[in-house]
Swiss-Prot record:
Its EC number is 2.4.2.61. GO terms for molecular function: ribitol beta-1,4-xylosyltransferase activity. The keyword Protein biosynthesis does not apply. This is Ribitol-5-phosphate xylosyltransferase 1. The chain crosses the membrane at residues 10-30. It is found in: Golgi apparatus membrane. Residues 38-79 are annotated as: Disordered. Belongs to the RXYLT1 family. The lineage of its organism: Eukaryota, Metazoa, Chordata, Craniata, Vertebrata. It catalyses: 3-O-[Rib-ol-P-Rib-ol-P-3-beta-D-GalNAc-(1->3)-beta-D-GlcNAc-(1->4)-(O-6-P-alpha-D-Man)]-Thr-[protein] + UDP-alpha-D-xylose = 3-O-[beta-D-Xyl-(1->4)-Rib-ol-P-Rib-ol-P-3-beta-D-GalNAc-(1->3)-beta-D-GlcNAc-(1->4)-(O-6-P-alpha-D-Man)]-Thr-[protein] + UDP + H(+). It comes from the Eukaryota. Residues 31-444 are extracellular. Keywords: Golgi apparatus, Membrane, Signal-anchor, Transferase, Transmembrane, Transmembrane helix. It comes from Mus musculus. One of its GO terms (biological process) is protein O-linked mannosylation.
Length: 444
């Protein structure tokens, strides 16, 4: 019994010692851990403060660069608003569509109509594709456009009643091809597969277009409207209307988007002329005048003796560079006063200097068309420099030397704005005339 008490006392003493040791450890070592924890927290706070300070410095630096932290969200919101507005516009437009017209492009001038005036796109984008098509809506009229070598009479389906046929009537071989298309359209009329037909014609440069007269409705034919290039004496503003020559789409001249540099950069050349200088022509006289007083050193001049129907990639780039880097583009007459160069210069904001004289042939009836040649451009207020003789050029070049860059920038803006307005106005006039002729005047 005594032994048991001794063991119990020993156990209690041992437990007391263990408790004392634990208490001593907790008192002396437990308190030492707290400062470590506090130090860790302080370190984290210090690191956070440093990071905050660093972010503050970075933020200040970004703000000094006018950085907008909400720029991405704002741009996304703006894109969403634009997309929504376009959807609303397209929906309202579709609801108002009353007419459908298909354009058959069988001449390169059709690409100027579709891509430059209508600002339409084509699928596929490949210019060598056999079949290309696109769609556009102008006012209440839905247009579809087809072009390419695979567009052949009798080999494509016709699901519209109203057609605009774009043809080339410049020379005999082209006239034969155009006539085949007109005969095909006439047969469609007879079988009531078509109701109305208009023709956009790349006419002869001498305005010798008598071959098409028999097809006009006014002469017992079936063509309601004729839009024709050059200053034809037939133009009456009713069923025969003038159409612009446009740019050389057959040479792959592109749709040009105006840029900041196009408007504001100093251009190294006062003028340019890249083209064919025919013997005993005003172009040859122009070349001689440019050589006087070193004027050819101020201009980008490259003349060739023979006309080339196609451009190489290099020659096309050189030509476009000349337009882009010249304040003026010299536009001497060729077979006709109107030339592709005029419209191509407008595309690049280079002021056309146009030789304003009538050429040989049947174009321009001066007794009734006092503004001929180029009466369409003049009627639309083209901001060009018109001259009657290239002897006027040296004085023009001298004046150019005194014009400030700011004045030139303003002049470019005026030209580019006018050209865009010119194309837009044509698109709406074209549509208004079609709607009036095809639909309004033919309502029963």
């Amino acid at each position: 019994m005594r032994l048991t008490r001794t063991r119990l006392c020993s156990l209690l003493v041992a437990l007391y010692c263990l408790f004392s040791i634990y208490a001593a450890y907790h008192v002396f070592f437990g308190r030492r851990r707290r400062p470590l924890g506090t130090t860790s927290r302080n370190s984290r706070k210090a690191a956070a403060a440093q990071a905050k300070e660093r972010r503050g410095r970075e933020q200040s630096a970004l703000e000094s660069e006018e950085w907008n932290p909400w720029e991405g969200d704002e741009k996304n919101e703006q894109r969403h608003r634009v997309k929504t507005n376009l959807q609303i516009l397209n929906k309202s437009t579709k609801e108002k569509i009353e007419h459908r017209v298909q354009i058959w492009g069988k001449a390169a001038i059709g690409l100027y109509l579709w891509e430059h005036i209508f600002e339409g796109t084509l699928d596929p984008a490949d210019v060598t594709a056999q079949w290309r098509e696109g769609q556009s809506v102008v006012g209440r009229t839905h247009y579809s456009f087809i072009t390419g070598p695979a567009v052949v009479p009798g080999y494509f389906s016709i699901d519209v009643d109203n057609v605009v046929l774009v043809l080339n009537g410049r020379e005999k071989a082209k006239i034969f091809h155009a006539t085949q298309w007109l005969i095909y359209a006439q047969n469609l009329m007879k079988t009531q597969k078509l109701q109305h037909l208009a023709v956009v014609l790349l006419g002869n440069e001498h305005c010798e277009n008598d071959w098409i007269m028999q097809f006009l409705k006014r002469n017992g034919g079936f063509v309601d409207l004729l839009f024709i290039t050059y200053d034809s004496p037939w133009i009456n503003g009713a069923d025969i209307l003038q159409w612009p020559l446009g740019v050389a789409t057959y040479r792959q001249f592109p749709v040009v988007e105006a840029s900041w540099t196009m408007l504001h950069d100093e251009r190294p050349y006062i003028c340019n002329f890249l083209g064919t200088a025919y013997e005993n022509s005003s172009r040859q006289a122009l070349m001689n005048i440019l050589k006087q007083d070193g004027n050819d050193k101020l201009c980008w001049v490259s003349a060739r003796e023979q006309w080339q129907p196609q451009e190489t990639n290099e020659s096309l780039k050189n030509y476009q560079d000349a337009l882009l880097h010249s304040d003026l583009t010299l536009c001497p007459v060729g077979v006709n006063t109107e030339c592709y160069r005029i419209y191509e210069a407008c595309s690049f904001g280079s002021i056309p200097v146009v030789e304003d004289v009538m050429t040989a042939g049947h174009c321009g009836n001066t007794t009734s068309q006092h503004s001929a040649p180029l009466q369409l451009l003049k009627a639309m207020g083209a901001p060009f420099i018109f001259i009657k003789n290239w002897k006027e050029l040296p004085a023009i070049l001298e004046k150019e030397k005194t014009i400030s860059l700011q004045e030139k920038i303003q002049r470019r803006k005026v030209l580019l704005h006018w050209y865009q307005h010119f194309k837009t106005e044509l698109k709406w006039k074209f549509t208004k005339i079609l709607e009036s002729s095809f639909f309004i005047n033919n309502k029963v």
